[in-house]
Amino acid sequence: MLTLAHYLVLGAILFAMSIVGIFLNRRNIIIILMAIELMLLAVNTNFVAFSHYLGDVHGQIFVFFVLTVAAAEAAIGLAILVTLFRKLDTINVEDLDQLKG
């Protein structure tokens, strides 16, 4: 039987993997966006685990709001990525300072 601690450890591992992914690869914006999405997944896992443990649905409802914000964040991030690639022919984060306006 899986307990709350198992889910919290899973969430902590996912969160740590996303932080490592952001700090080790600061150049590629696609990897950074994927790491941020993984971080939000870890937070959602903890919300659902606590919600189930406490017998309350508020945590599960909050997950839907987080998923909505994550979808909007991914869409905006990919739009910025497409603009960056069209202007500079690269997806390197260090080249973002060359964009003006």
UniProtKB/Swiss-Prot annotation:
InterPro entries: NADH_UbQ_OxRdtase_chain4L/K, NUOK/Mnh_C1-like. Keywords: Cell inner membrane, Cell membrane, Membrane, NAD, Quinone, Translocase, Transmembrane, Transmembrane helix, Transport, Ubiquinone. Pfam families: Oxidored_q2. The keyword Transport applies. The chain crosses the membrane at residues 4-24, 29-49, 61-81. Its EC number is 7.1.1.-. It catalyses: a quinone + NADH + 5 H(+)(in) = a quinol + NAD(+) + 4 H(+)(out). It is a multi-pass membrane protein. The keyword Repeat does not apply. One of its GO terms (cellular component) is NADH dehydrogenase complex. NDH-1 shuttles electrons from NADH, via FMN and iron-sulfur (Fe-S) centers, to quinones in the respiratory chain. The immediate electron acceptor for the enzyme in this species is believed to be ubiquinone. Couples the redox reaction to proton translocation (for every two electrons transferred, four hydrogen ions are translocated across the cytoplasmic membrane), and thus conserves the redox energy in a proton gradient. HAMAP family: NDH1_NuoK (MF_01456). Belongs to the complex I subunit 4L family. This is NADH-quinone oxidoreductase subunit K. The gene is nuoK.
